[in-house]
Amino acid sequence: MVLIEQVVLVASILITFGTCLAATKYAARLFPHFEPLQFYDEATNPMELNIVLAFVVGLIGSVVVLLYFDSQKIKPVLNPTQWQQYRLMEKQKLSDNTALYRFKLPRSNNILGLPIGQHISVQANMGGKTVVRSYTPTSSDDDHGFFDLVVKSYEQGNVSKYIGSMKIGDLLSVKGPKGQMRYAPGLSRHIGMIAGGTGLTPCLQIIRAALKNPADKTQIDFIYANVKETDILLKDELDELALKHKDQFRISYFLNEAPEGWKGGVGFVTKEALEKNLPKPANDIKVLMCGPPPMIKAMTGHLEALGYEKPRTVSKLEDQVFCF
């Protein structure tokens, strides 16, 4: 409940109680200097104090109920200017060095409050130095009481290594939201996506949002590149979404080290692969990218050669090519 609501509530209680008390002789007894203001008469029922007390009890009960329902409201917890700590409640291994981490929100009806396509800042103390990195939760505001991060822990990493070492019950410092992307139905007629490794996370957030909304007709083509097949994150979910929404969502996998019998792309993503799998350049399409810097640099060059607009250093929502 915001401060102004609290002030109004307290003022209403005091005014109501004062008015009720003024209707009885007890106001004059409690506050003699207010006696000229009393408007009772001598014929007042001797049970009037009980009436006042019953009214007050009822009023207090109403306030308690009001506060209870206020506590049950779905409330976002993120604060863009203040670090807040959330406790690790689950850890699920996805690959050799990648896991899904589930963090508990203060209440079961809380939501993170993250616009689709935006991310959070995560803070860790490493060797006496504070390090901050950005991550995109794979959960959404449809998920109450928790949020999920998919993190690949690198041996030479900072925050990723810190998260990888966390144990159940440990606390993580978070603030946000931040970022220029804010997805909504109708943002583009057709979206192409290019991701490498954990660059999947902002793309997946948008994919889920678009496909679960029957009114959202956005076409999505997704190129997802990894080193090995075991590096492909959440593949079962991606394949299920592609099968269930085959008229709207298509995914193309690329591996540097493809196993025997692999039916997807092999090697680095080429200009020809982009031309084949992405929407053609137009005013009503977007290409979203997230991955390692060398990959993004290579993809940017390929896209420019194919006639797409050159992305800005810091992408904006209106850009045709957007880099997370």
Curated annotation (Swiss-Prot):
Q: Please state the Enzyme Commission number of this protein.
A: 1.6.2.2
Instruction: Read off the PROSITE patterns from this record.
Output: FAD_FR
The membrane topology of this protein is: Single-pass membrane protein
Show the InterPro entries listed in the entry.
Answer: CBR-like (IPR001834), Cbr1-like_FAD-bd_dom (IPR008333), FAD-bd_FR_type (IPR017927), Flavoprot_Pyr_Nucl_cyt_Rdtase (IPR001709), FNR_nucleotide-bd (IPR039261), OxRdtase_FAD/NAD-bd (IPR001433), Riboflavin_synthase-like_b-brl (IPR017938)
- Give the range the annotation lists for the signal sequence: none
Main localization category: mitochondrion
Record-linked Gene3D superfamilies: Nucleotide-binding domain of ferredoxin-NADP reductase (FNR) module (3.40.50.80), Translation factors (2.40.30.10)
Q: Which GO terms describe its molecular function?
A: 2-(3-amino-3-carboxypropyl)histidine synthase activity; cytochrome-b5 reductase activity, acting on NAD(P)H; NADH dehydrogenase activity
Where is it located? Mitochondrion outer membrane
Q: Where are the bilayer-spanning segments?
A: 49-69
Pfam families linked: FAD_binding_6, NAD_binding_1
Could you say which enzyme class this protein belongs to?
Answer: oxidoreductase
The record lists the catalysed reaction(s) as:
2 Fe(III)-[cytochrome b5] + NADH = 2 Fe(II)-[cytochrome b5] + NAD(+) + H(+); 2 Fe(3+)-[Dph3] + NADH = 2 Fe(2+)-[Dph3] + NAD(+) + H(+)
Q: Pathway it acts in?
A: Protein modification; peptidyl-diphthamide biosynthesis
FAD-binding FR-type domain location is 81-184
Q: Name one GO biological process term.
A: protein histidyl modification to diphthamide
**Cofactor(s) needed by this chain:** FAD
Gene Ontology CC, one term: mitochondrial outer membrane
Q: Which residues bind FAD?
A: 164-179, 190-222
Q: Which UniProt keywords apply?
A: FAD, Flavoprotein, Membrane, Mitochondrion, Mitochondrion outer membrane, NAD, Oxidoreductase, Transferase, Transmembrane, Transmembrane helix
Assembly notes? Monomer. Component of the 2-(3-amino-3-carboxypropyl)histidine synthase complex composed of DPH1, DPH2, DPH3 and a NADH-dependent reductase, predominantly CBR1.
Functional note: NADH-dependent reductase for DPH3 and cytochrome b5. Required for the first step of diphthamide biosynthesis, a post-translational modification of histidine which occurs in elongation factor 2. DPH1 and DPH2 transfer a 3-amino-3-carboxypropyl (ACP) group from S-adenosyl-L-methionine (SAM) to a histidine residue, the reaction is assisted by a reduction system comprising DPH3 and a NADH-dependent reductase, predominantly CBR1. By reducing DPH3, also involved in the formation of the tRNA wobble base modification mcm5s 2U (5-methoxycarbonylmethyl-2-thiouridine), mediated by the elongator complex.
Q: Which family does it belong to?
A: Belongs to the flavoprotein pyridine nucleotide cytochrome reductase family.
Entry protein name: NADH-cytochrome b5 reductase 1
